[in-house]
From Swiss-Prot:
Keyword Transport: no
Assembly, per entry: Heterotrimer of A, B and C subunits.
The organism of origin for this protein: Bacillus cytotoxicus (strain DSM 22905 / CIP 110041 / 391-98 / NVH 391-98)
One example of a Gene Ontology biological process annotation: translation
Lineage, top ranks: Bacteria, Bacillati, Bacillota, Bacilli, Bacillales
Protein name per UniProt: Aspartyl/glutamyl-tRNA(Asn/Gln) amidotransferase subunit B
Catalytic activity: L-glutamyl-tRNA(Gln) + L-glutamine + ATP + H2O = L-glutaminyl-tRNA(Gln) + L-glutamate + ADP + phosphate + H(+); L-aspartyl-tRNA(Asn) + L-glutamine + ATP + H2O = L-asparaginyl-tRNA(Asn) + L-glutamate + ADP + phosphate + 2 H(+)
A molecular function GO annotation: glutaminyl-tRNA synthase (glutamine-hydrolyzing) activity
Transmembrane segments: none
Domain of life: Bacteria
Pfam families linked to this entry: GatB_N (PF02934), GatB_Yqey (PF02637)
Length: 476
């Protein structure tokens, strides 16, 4: 029997506002525990929440970027549950009137494009953070309590873990472009839960789902779904029954582990938040927010292909993150050739960042520096090989490419007379290589070029070297 995998994702995104959603408490990450709280966050008797308009603007902006319909009437509700990191014993969220719904984004996997539906996007407040010491007690930090969140619930439209990974990558990219969140999973500003079930191919009814938690990276989302997919298939093929469970992904064993069995759906006893009035969003407000949405990744990707002549793959990689795309834009605006800028960013720059586990903002390289270096290559002042030495200096220490070239004596040798003299000396000392080349051994020319580059410390103009070398060989 063959099975079809059904995957849906719930993503929580922390909004980058200066204050919390219902209080004036600050939102800075990394502050000392319990130093960014207020009586409103902690639910003291008699205090009243005040809605942060910027959080509403950010939620609308994200919803619009995700092609959602924006509600004209929306409201907040109390979601009732008790947990130590929830001091009010309820969370202010949205139940039946979310701020956005019926959206979609387009992903691409294996060259195939697919539209993934978004059921809803709603606003809510975050809970505090519990730390379990393992010594008989737990600690709670309420700094996170009351931070503004949007929850983005997808339709169960994904059929493979690869599609789930692509969805998350695209979702993160769009949200980052809007500027409403930095989407840093390591800081908790983007969190994801996954729901997965299997059903026989051709069957319309969904199978029993498992919910996966503790997914701390997009890679873990994919790996957790892959394991769960295999686990459920094995269970069904052996005649077993899938129970509705909450499971967590264990990074060490690369398996999902049972947390609890769900006998029914959670009953949070939602009811309208009595301390907040309904919110009415008119067309003028919507248009103001819509006008603030910048160029999004798909539009940039199309522009890079149409106007800059980049291959679709290059355009895709460059627009994955706004940081990289903005860096590319500034590099080209500084006068660098678009394709050369793309090659350097996708090659040397990404390789360095991946190796050092850094982001562009963490290195000394600037768009202006990269642009000037590329223009030195285009002018023939330095070769691509020498440029790598300049690049290493720029990304580690910064500086002006022209000054680095002069200080290190890296100017490319393009004087024909100087190069011809060096070529002649190399040929005089390598008669056998000349003979090998004339006998059809093409590798011999590579050896000779290598000797010339060694003699010039890599500073010889490669095209000119090849030209002179062939001329001098043909004379012999």
């Amino acid at each position: 029997m063959n099975f079809e995998t059904i995957i849906g994702l719930e993503v929580h995104v922390e909004l980058k506002t200066n204050s919390k959603i219902f209080s004036a408490s600050p939102t800075e990450f990394g502050a000392d525990p319990n130093t960014q709280t207020s009586v409103i966050d902690l639910g003291y008797p008699g205090v009243l929440p005040t809605l942060n308009k910027e959080a509403v603007n950010f939620a609308m902006k994200a919803a619009m970027a995700l092609n959602c319909e924006i509600a004209t009437e929306t409201k907040f509700d109390r979601k009732n549950y008790f947990y130590p990191d929830n001091p009010k014993a309820y969370q202010i969220s949205q139940f039946d009137k979310p701020i956005g719904q019926n959206g979609w984004i387009e992903i691409e996997v294996g060259g195939q494009k697919k539209r993934i539906g978004i059921t809803r996007l709603h606003l809510e407040e975050d809970a505090g953070k519990s730390t379990h010491t393992g010594e008989g007690y737990s600690l709670v930090d309420y700094n996170r309590q009351g931070l503004p969140l949007i929850e983005i619930v997808s339709e169960p439209d994904m059929r493979t873990p690869e599609e789930a990974y692509a969805y998350l990558e695209k979702l993160k990219s769009i949200i980052q472009y809007t500027g409403v969140s930095d989407c840093k999973m390591e800081e908790g500003s983007l969190r994801c839960d996954a729901n997965i079930s299997l059903r026989p191919v051709g069957q319309e009814k969904f199978g029993t789902k498992a919910e996966l938690k503790n997914l701390n990276s997009f890679t873990y989302v994919q790996k957790g779904l892959e394991f769960e997919q295999a686990r459920q298939e094995k269970e069904l093929l052996s005649g077993g029954i899938i129970q509705q469970e909450t499971r967590r992904y264990d990074e060490a064993t690369k398996k999902t582990i049972l947390m609890r069995v769900k006998e029914g759906s959670d009953d949070y006893r939602y009811f309208p938040e009595p301390d907040l009035v309904e919110l009415y969003i008119d067309e003028e407000w919507k248009e103001q927010v819509r006008a603030s949405i910048p160029e999004l990744p798909d539009a940039r990707k199309a522009r890079y292909v149409a106007e800059l002549g980049l291959p679709a793959y290059d355009a895709h990689v460059l627009t994955l993150t706004k940081e990289m795309s903005d860096f590319f834009e500034e590099t080209v605006a500084g006068g660098a050739d678009a394709k050369l800028a793309s090659n350097w960013l996708m090659g040397e720059v990404l390789a360095y960042l991946n190796k050092q586990q850094k982001e562009l903002k963490d290195v000394a390289l600037t768009p202006a520096g990269l642009s000037k270096m590329i223009q030195l290559i285009e002018k023939g002042t330095i070769s691509s090989k020498i440029a790598k030495k300049v690049f290493n200096e720029l990304i580690e220490k910064g500086g002006d490419p022209e000054e680095i070239v002069k200080a290190k004596g890296l100017v490319q040798i393009s004087d024909e007379g100087t190069l011809r003299k060096i070529v002649t000396e190399i040929l005089d000392n390598n008669a056998q290589s000349i003979e090998d080349f004339k006998n059809g051994k093409d590798r011999a020319i590579g050896f000779l070029v290598g000797q010339i580059m060694k003699a010039t410390k890599g500073q010889a103009n490669p095209p000119l070297v090849n030209k002179i070398l062939l001329e001098e060989i043909n004379k012999r």
